Amino acid sequence: MDNLITQLINLFAAVILMLAFAMLSQRRILTLIHLFTLQGLTVVASTVAVAYVTHQHHLYYSAALTLALKCFLIPYLLHRLINRLNVRWDIETLINIPTIMLIGIVLVVFSFNLALPIAKLSASIARGTLGIAIACFLLSFMMMITRAKAVPQVIGFLSMENALFFAATSATYGMPMVVELGIALDVLVGVLILGVFMFQIREQFDSLDISHLEKLKED
Amino acid sequence: MDALLLVFLTPLAGALVLALIGHRAYARDLNVVFSLGTFLAAAALTVRIISDGPLFALDKQFFIDPLNVFLVTLTAFVGLSTSIFSRPYMRVEQDHGKMTPLRMRLYFSMYQLFSFTMLVALMTNNMGILWVAMEAATLTTVLLVSIYRTPASLEAAWKYFILCGVGIAQALFGTILLYMAADRVIGDSADALLWTNLEVVKMQLDPTIMSLAFIFLLLGYGTKVGLVPVHNWLPDAHAEGPTPISAVLSGLLLNVALYAVIRCKVLTDGALHSPFAGNLMIGFGLLSVVAAAFFLSRQKDVKRMFAYSSIEHMGLMTFAFGMGGPIANFAGLLHMTVHSLVKSAIFFAVGHAAQQAGTQIMEDIKGLIKVTPSVGWGLMLGSLAILGMPPFGVFASEFLILTTAMRELPWATPFLLLALGVAFAAIFSRVQEMVFGQTALKPLAHPPALLPVFVHLGLALMLGLYIPPYLDVWYRQAARLIGG
Amino acid sequence: MNLSGLLSQFLAIMAALLLAPLLTGWVNQWRAWLQNRSGPGLLQPYRMLRKLFIKESVVAESASPLFRMAPYVAFGCMLLSCAIIPTLSTDLPLSPAADAIALVGLFAMARVFMALAAMDIGTAFGSLGARREMLIGFLAEPALLSVLFTASLISQSTALTEIVENLAHRDFVLYPSLAFAGIAFCLVSFAENARVPVDNPTTHLELTMIHEALILEYSGRHLALIEWAISLKLFAYSCIGLALFFPWGIAEAQAPVALILAIPAMLFKLAIGGFLLALIETLCAKMRIFRVPEFLATAFLMAVIGMLTHFLLGS
């Protein structure tokens, strides 16, 4: 049974990676939010699976916390945000999507290589997942780089946080509870501040296009 | 222990109170009072440490050792003087209509909250809490950078948020890896991230994981230190935010971030038995010093110019800590202190000067010495101090760093000298034009607060001529703690 | 080679030949129902084949022998590939003839001949269709190969029968790499079988058609063979998919009872698969042809990540 659940965790890891790629190639902002929610759910599911196998009860709490935050509160805030700002446009990427995908593969290879020596050492149940977490981290990073609009950048930022949380649960069975609470608080406050920001940006520029924010350059 | 709690509970209380009444006229004074309270608590704490030695609090989650106690005192002190400086500064901004009552409340409460997060970051024993506090420090300042709501300030704040957010996410990843390494040695307990515990077992931490962890931690916290090439947020945030915030960012936040890097380096060195971490820091430090010096010479905005100077000096400190050894560490710590004091003094003077001129463009600021001699002299002396002129403390620390570099890394010395030379020429020529020359500037409506400027410069001067024995002991103990 | 091997091989070929048009009919019927139409009936493909075989075949004057040969080659390729895919049993005497890589080669050969034949006449539509078909093929083949490689990595063999034997008759293990491969395979199958997101099999709108443009010049028995080959291709792809990702119910060697049970199992799986195909076709809109490279790049990427995941997760 435990063996099966370990495989399940690996499968969740694969799904998270798949969703990271889906987000990378997604043009619609609403779908992007749905994918982000789905990724959050998968992370929660894998956390619960880890908690079940390792009997780490505090992981159930952090799974619940993540569920509330990543699957309900933040998606709700994002939905409200795009409704209020009325931004449902398609996102134009700065590089065309097949190229992004190819770079994505390179990133995955890179992060798998990076994680391989550690995976060999690790005694944790799902040792391969660290590489996937690094890959998701880098993919979200690239998503932030390649999008010129504010909302997708924020989603990229949050999905980066998802990857980190996944790394923490699968590779080390979760951080100490104080730290996790702190991280959750920071993320929540961060999202609120970003929301405030977007209103300010739109007030100033009548647009959420980050390319307006390129005045401050080195002369 | 009471003093320890008081040190960070005072700013937290201040943040709450000022969030409610920050728009009242007396809030400016209240801000000073809270900062003074923090400073007094920090001073009391210092006295305790001198007599009793290192101590813990709250189930070992917080601790004070020779390394962080002097940074706590420094932070509380610069926090106090900046609050004194922001009294007249914010009054002028209010008169200019840049600050609404709501923004004043935001400003004061965030200012206190920012002090709180930095003090927590310095005093926490838990590497995870350190991360949380660093992220919180970004969050509290990001709204302050965009407080004027101008397009440029929004852009700066967005950049600050996104770049530091990404950077700090890398640091979190490094922390997770650190926990993974600790997990294998200490076991899966909530105490596995306590620095004091990690320090004990650092020899047994797995080298592969630790080297990867350190790369992420250095990149992450290095973003907040302002190391090139992840420095882009720094000049913008410094130039577009209110000047008191520029002063605390440069004088304090960068120090705290570097402090986090040093803590991580100690652990990595122990695990790796090789100069890997030090070499990385030397590389990033040297790159920052050289790149910042050249960027610096091309700036037109005075606050941007001094922001680049901060990058240069942080690079120099990173370089020094990277070399390691008692002398370089000593010099790095000394440089940290004097740079904080001098750079915040410069920003105070620059703030007043920019308010007089109504602009931050250096070409439009002329003849300060004729209008307000004290501001002019403050800027001139501060610039000379930051450029490493004897007898200021910066000279002493830079001299120590350079001589160590000549002995240990002879190839790096020409680069350092070149960078310092370029920076000297750039800053000195610009500042000379700003201080002297014909002018059409008008004096300020409210008398500028120049006490902090000259107190800071005086302290920097003192540290250049004479380091008091107890300070010397501190530095030596801290330098030994960093080891390397 | 023994009797039961011969029997299962014979059964596999007969099943493919007879059931392939039925599968096409089933998918079309469901498509009609899902679109609120009454539909042509399940047996329509058989009626059409009969009609086409009776009709006279008209060949253009400028056609070379290649044009006449192509339908037979395509049909032969598809039949051979159906023969080596373990649809009912893994005990196939023909399977050593071709492994997974050769299977992709067989598909490619059929494609090349069809494209050549389309250009042979010299009409504009033929060349256009050929060009588009080759574009899709050249993008889809690496993806399909990577999918098959992922599966062969798990069982350390490129022979389809061994892969299926490994997957079906070992302890149940979740393979994350197969999840990626599965998605990639679905995408490739849509493209290769000219189904909706990539191509519309029922279209005769000149500008959008890909596959139909290739066979515009064919008639009579040639067309019948091509239609049958197309049905066989869909059948082959469905069976590869079922064999790799849902291998339960496929019989092993020397198991006559299992062989008999495998027939209803296969019918059941194909019925569900066909329904899902119709459902997806109804839900999706056909994409612009410029988007197809992106679509297939995604498939390729998924397959490659599947392989990488296999190396990393190592299970």
Q: Where are the model-predicted features located?
A:
Chain A
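Alpha-helical transmembrane segments of multi-pass membrane proteins predominantly involved
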Residues: 1-219
